[in-house]
Design a protein with these regions (language model features):
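Structural alpha/beta surface segment adjacent to cysteine/selenocysteine redox centers
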Residues: 1-80
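C-terminal cap of thioredoxin/glutaredoxin-like
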Residues: 1, 64-67, 71, 75-139
Length: 139
């Protein structure tokens, strides 16, 4: 879903535009989750925020190809939050898909097709219709 559409509908703001106390709380939550889950996590990744649409589109393309996207989603998140890579770049997304045993090049090409973008737009509309206000959200 397109968070740039969803956030303003509920009065939400991107992290960089939030007041200092909300940014501080965000940082505290990251630290709590890192400790709770015992995972690697950069609190301020080099490439965040970034354009998340390419990552969403490659996940949609994988799903449309019949793949379970749980591992791919995790690999993409690791690229950003652990490995300091930009998930707006094709090379990063292709590498993430390949690491999951998928054909990253084929999925990258599929992610640029109209049906992937239409699904992205439909996901955004569904999120809006169901009053989603942020991410992650599970419907």
């Amino acid at each position: 879903m397109n968070l740039a559409v969803i956030f303003p509908q509920s009065g939400g703001l991107p992290l960089g535009k939030r007041p200092p106390q909300r940014r501080a709380y965000h940082m505290m939550e990251l630290k709590r989750w890192k400790a709770h889950l015992s995972v690697d996590l950069n609190y301020e990744p080099k490439h965040f925020p970034t354009n998340d649409m390419p990552a969403a589109l490659i996940a949609i393309a994988a799903q449309q190809a019949g793949h379970n996207i749980a591992d791919l989603s995790l690999a993409i998140m690791r690229k950003c939050w652990v490995e300091e890579m930009d998930v707006a770049e094709d090379a990063t997304l292709i590498e993430a898909a390949n690491q999951c045993g998928l054909d990253g090049t084929a999925l990258s090409a599929a992610s640029k097709q109209d049906d992937a973008k239409q699904a992205y737009d439909a996901n955004t509309q569904e999120a809006s219709d169901k009053q989603v206000f942020g991410a992650p959200t599970y419907i």
